[in-house]
Amino acid sequence: MSEKNLKVGARVELTGKDLLGTVAYVGMTSFAVGKWVGVVLDEPKGKNSGSIKGQQYFQCDENCGMFVRPTQLRLLEAAPGSRRSIEDVSGATPTAAQPTKARLSSSRTSLSSSRQSLLGSRTQLTTSLSERTASSSSIGPRKSLAPQNSKDKESPSTSLAEGAPAASGGNGAASHASSKRASFVETGFLEILKPQFTPSQPLRSPSFTMPSNSGAEDKVALLEAQKTSAELQAQLADLTEKLETLKQRRNEDKERLREFDKMKIQFEQLQEFRTKIMGAQASLQKELLRAKQEAKDAIEAKEQHAQEMADLADNVEMITLDKEMAEEKADTLQLELESSKERIEELEVDLELLRSEMQNKAESAIGNISGGGDSPGLSTYEFKQLEQQNIRLKETLVRLRDLSAHDKHDIQKLSKELEMKRSEVTELERTKEKLSAKIDELEAIVADLQEQVDAALGAEEMVEQLAEKKMELEDKVKLLEEEIAQLEALEEVHEQLVESNHELELDLREELDLANGAKKEVLRERDAAIETIYDRDQTIVKFRELVQKLNDQLTELRDRNSSNEKESLQDPSLKMVTETIDYKQMFAESKAYTRAIDVQLRQIELSQANEHVQMLTAFMPESFMSRGGDHDSILVILLISRIVFKCDIVVSQTRERFPPVDAITREAVTQGHAVQQYAFKCRLLHYVHSLQCALHQILYGLNSCQPDTLLRAGSSLPEMVAQEKIVDGIIELLKSNQLDENSTTDNIEKCVAFFNAMNSVLLAGEQLLNEIQMIRDCVASLGAACESILSDTAIAKVIIQEAGATSDSVLLIQFLNENMESVRQQVKLIKRRLPSDQHVIKSGLSQHKVEAMRGLAQNISRIMSAMHQATKQSLAAIVSTIESDNAAEHTLPQEKYWALLTASCERIYEQDDRGPTQNFKTLLAQANSDLQLIAQHLLDKEYDIISAANNASNQQKSGAHSTPITQRAQLIKKQLEQKNVLAATLENREADVKQLKVAAKMKQNELSEMQIRKDLAEKKLSVLQNEYEHAVDKWKQKYEETSLQLQLKEKEFEETMDHLQSDIDALESEKSDLRDKLKLNSTTGKVQPGSESHSPHNISLSGNTSTAPGISNVSYSAPAGTAPVVAEEVELLKNAFNQERNQRLRLQAQDMRAKLSQFEPLHVPQPQDQRITALESELTRMKHAWVLSLLQVRSQDSVNSGTRIDAVALQRRNQPVPLKGEISSKASQLASDILTEYLQRKPHRATHGQFASFPTVDVKRVLQI
């Protein structure tokens, strides 16, 4: 009965058991596939109480519940209300799903625990990174000599990070402060270090040498020079003291550098120790995971064993249920068999009545023909046939009208949908035009803004940017190094997450494989059920046809007997038969309606299956769907199996359509068509069995060959599809009842030749042969050929004129009869001795003998063709003679038949023709001997064949033999996995390439920057060169002027020297005169009164002359008129000396000032600022919140599962984590606060406007604003 009528609460009756009950459950169950109905019986004759295998479906008393199929129930009373049928059990969980859920819960628990451990490791990594940065920043910066005017100038870049002194580097407070400063430094406020200055030796003071022949003015100048040298020595001592202080500071810096190197070495050692600890932790983690996996595998094995035991118990219960169902089914079938036997007996009685009536009719018709009377009109039987045809035509007309109305309705519906789609398209086009207009406006606005931005950026700003870019890049390098360290930590966390996800993926794949296996089992059961349903439908169709025929005969009998009312009244059994016929007809009509509904449902299933296949093929790559690919290979296998199935249909329908002939007489040959139809059936079956032989071998080969051979076979799909149309044509002829003896078999012969050639071409390199199936097909083909040849020989016997028994044609026909009978007996014997198991492949025969049997079938096919052509031409000749001469006999001379047979042998055998007798006798003698050998071998080796087949099947089950389709599928899966791996590798390579491109771009930018610097340096060099040339010209002019003045002074000096020389000469002459006078005075001995005043002068003169004659000459030789000139010259020399000394001191001071300005300014430690500390702590919290927002994953499944979770881990997991949007807004606000604080502390870094202050370009780049 229909499953739609079965609802909970309905009253039903169990067919065949006379039990009443109430429906309590309708739906799917876990103990068997399909829909079951739970019935609460009125009597305690059930089998359960509503529960099976620990699962409660409904409640009732003990032994009052029973589960049956919907087809075993008959509805007595519908449900009182519209209660919904229970489609699935929601309160109980099947035991089969418990291991899977346990495995999922354990995997999820391990995943959550691994994530918690990863969060802890991530916190440790961030802490270590902050400590690393703190240790690097805790080293005190180098001190440098600040210039004297440092109060008026400000340093171009300062660091916000405060270095702790080296002496206090061990206490905890300093390390905590340094870690805070290090976390604050990570934002990019770094100071760019300048190269240190190593002062050179001080310049020596120039030496000044006096000429040896200078006068008193030179002595004064020497004194001044000594005085200046003393001053210079004092300055030199001051500078040496400063140099010593600088050297002392540099020595202190070197000691600090040594301490820094020591700390760096310790840091590297700690890093190595940390890596070793991390490696040991990773190995321990892996061992822990391995141990967990082993424990999980053991638990799964235990659960699987328990599940298997539960499945065994379920199977036992199912077997008992199936046994009971089989017993019930056997009872019903026994009842149906008895009713069918009674019906057959009744129909046999009716058939005998009809035969007697037809014989009487035939005798009356023969009497009318012999009497020369005209044939009467249409009989009642023919009239009834015409009425039935009219009724069928009317029904067809009504169906066509319904179909046309349905098509019109569909066309109107599609037209309405088309109009709706057009209106939607117009609306979308309007929306597109509006959006395109908006896009154009926005692009114009963007272009204007871009032009404004380009106009705002000037050349000077670009030069400044390029000049300062190196400093910014150094800052960025430091930032990037810190980011790289953080990313390496994140990479480690990511690798651990990937490992945990990989384990989860393996678990899910195992579950997916189990689900796919269950799905395949369900599909196999569904296919078996569909095959069973199809076989039953075929049987029902045959019975319906038989019932229809018998109904027609009964209606005819009813019409004939209606005229005789008295006899009908006297025979009450006929009335009973009529009533039963009417009841059966009504039952057949109801069955026909049910069949129509089933056909519609199957049509829906077929359309959905086709759509499913189309959707699945849409996911396949182009290589799968390409010509000669895997898709074509699958289609080839399906095509060959489909052609084999169609051949079976042709065989069965042809045997039913053309029954065998009881006796072949001359009247049956010349006046009827039954003999020719039977011969045609035999030939057709021979070719169909030959086609099946080739197809079976190709199908076996394609299921056992290499994948390359299968792909090669896929390329021949179009040719095979064309050959399939030949078989489809034969089936169409069978459907239209147009297949008869006049139909040609040339196409099927070409099809057989094509597939034999394809078998030899495709499977030539591989020895793949299904021997048993080939023998079975060849036996069927030989049997049909023998039947055809025997029918042709029988026709030849009755149409050849009787003559002597020694003629060639008669002898050949007798020989053919005897040998064909022998071959047919041998074929039947081989067929009986073949194993019934279809999975048996090997027969123990050599390949040469098996191929010889196929050749034997082909050779007998040639004999069959020759005999058929000769018989056909003979009948045509007889018909032509009858048409020309009605009095001629329906026979043919032996000589003419022999000539026709010889001509047909020449056409068929061509070059191998040796005459009919020779052709047939040699072949049939060899055929008998070969078939006897094969039959004897099958009889002797029957046990060996079966045992070898069993061994092969066991080996096949244990060896996991896979078909080429499975191998190709596994290969494609591996290729997809490799493709995914390659895609991941390619993505990594692309990321590396992008990084390299970024690095190359940075290098290109640096190169362009260096090029610009080079151009600027060349420009400055050219400017300096011009200035130098201009200065050289100036100095040349000054040199020439000075040289002219020197020449003039030399001339004046020479003149003065000449004048002085004349004065000296005059003084010498005067001196000599005075000496002469002095001598004269001494000789006279007279001393004058004024001589005492002059004597000291003379003494001093003599002393002077004795000590330093040169000086006395210079001192006392000058007259009174030359003293102003000498004093003026001395004054000029003093002025020149003072100017030169001042210029030299000024240049030395400038040089020292320039050298001191190149030194790095000393860092003055500032007291701790509360605002900076607050900003650092806020920044640290922001970083931790951002990292937690990236790694926090809340797993609801793990919470719902029954695993134990630590309270602290649960509290941390349930701790609220802010969203990324909130963190981003807070981060932007914090950045603006930091920038504001920085600009307040460093106002020179800001550009002041009328309304606000903005950071400069370098600050923007450092902060990445």
Curated annotation (Swiss-Prot):
One of its GO terms (molecular function) is dynein complex binding. It is found in: Cytoplasm; Cytoplasm, Cytoskeleton. Residues 213-570, 812-836, 967-1084, 1128-1160 form a coiled coil. SUPFAM superfamilies: Cap-Gly domain. Keywords: Coiled coil, Cytoplasm, Cytoskeleton, Dynein, Microtubule, Phosphoprotein. Pfam families: CAP_GLY, Dynactin. Residues 103-138, 161-177 have a biased composition (Low complexity). Residues 27-69 form the CAP-Gly domain. GO terms for cellular component: aster; axon; axon cytoplasm; centrosome; cytoplasm; dynactin complex; dynein complex; kinetochore. Residues 81-179, 1082-1106 are annotated as: Disordered. GO terms for biological process: axon extension; axonal transport of mitochondrion; cell fate determination; cellularization; centrosome localization; centrosome separation; compound eye photoreceptor cell differentiation; compound eye photoreceptor development. The modification Phosphoserine is found at S85, S110, S114, S117, S121, S183, S1117. Part of the dynactin complex that activates the molecular motor dynein for ultra-processive transport along microtubules. Plays a key role in dynein-mediated retrograde transport of vesicles and organelles along microtubules by recruiting and tethering dynein to microtubules. Binds to both dynein and microtubules providing a link between specific cargos, microtubules and dynein. Belongs to the dynactin 150 kDa subunit family. Monomer and homodimer. Subunit of dynactin, a multiprotein complex part of a tripartite complex with dynein and a adapter, such as BICDL1, BICD2 or HOOK3. The dynactin complex is built around ACTR1A/ACTB filament and consists of an actin-related filament composed of a shoulder domain, a pointed end and a barbed end. Its length is defined by its flexible shoulder domain. The soulder is composed of 2 DCTN1 subunits, 4 DCTN2 and 2 DCTN3. DCTN1/p150(glued) binds directly to microtubules and to cytoplasmic dynein. This is Dynactin subunit 1. It comes from Drosophila melanogaster. The gene is DCTN1-p150.
